[in-house]
Amino acid sequence: MTIFSSLNQFSKGHVSWLLLLLFIIFFEACALYFQHVMMLAPCVMCIYERVAMMGIGGAAIIGLIAPNNALFRWLGLIGWGLSSYKGLMLAMQHVDYQFNPSPFATCDLFVTFPSWAPLNQWVPWMFEAYGDCSKIVWQFFDLSMPQWLVVIFAGNLVALALIVIAQFFPVKRKNPIR
């Protein structure tokens, strides 16, 4: 059995989608820890990156519903890809704000959500921004938080690419005679 056949089989099980969801819950819990325990004020870009991360969680839930069903699995994969890509673009823009500050390129002062989903009004403790995008308030191994998000979102895209490629490799069935 090739690695891609194994990944194909793995993507058709609940464990793979649950694992993705647990990673996202961990990252969101870290964000809330930074905000409410370490008192690091989230900026507008942080909130948008948080929403992108939750998009991956939503995609994981879709895939978790019926991973053996091609429709649910592909909807989950597409949602995972779109959210990861958007998160990567946001994180790279955030890194640019931090390391190439300019008075002409700044993030918004307030988050803007659609009128049909004002997340910052519904759940302000999670989606209200009051920090400065250009300030580096935390580092780990010399990487700022948005730089870590670039790594995380890019890692999601690499994992997704491998799993999407694996969808075109047949799952080898065990020999029933043995």
Swiss-Prot record:
Entry GO terms, CC: plasma membrane
Function as written in the Swiss-Prot or TrEMBL entry: Required for disulfide bond formation in some periplasmic proteins. Acts by oxidizing the DsbA protein.
InterPro entries assigned: DiS_bond_form_DsbB/BdbC, Disulphide_bond_form_DsbB, DsbB, DsbB-like_sf
The UniProt record lists the keyword Cell inner membrane: yes
GO terms classed as biological process: protein folding
Membrane association type: Multi-pass membrane protein
Major location category of this protein: membrane
Cysteine pairings via disulfide bonds: C43-C46, C107-C133
Keyword Cell membrane assigned: yes
Topological domain ranges for the Cytoplasmic compartment: 1-16, 68-74, 167-178
Ranges in the topological domain labelled Periplasmic: 34-51, 93-147
NCBIfam families recorded: PRK01749.1
Subcellular location field: Cell inner membrane
Pfam families in the record: DsbB
Listed GO MF terms: electron transfer activity; protein-disulfide reductase activity
Protein name: Disulfide bond formation protein B
TM stretches of this protein: 17-33, 52-67, 75-92, 148-166
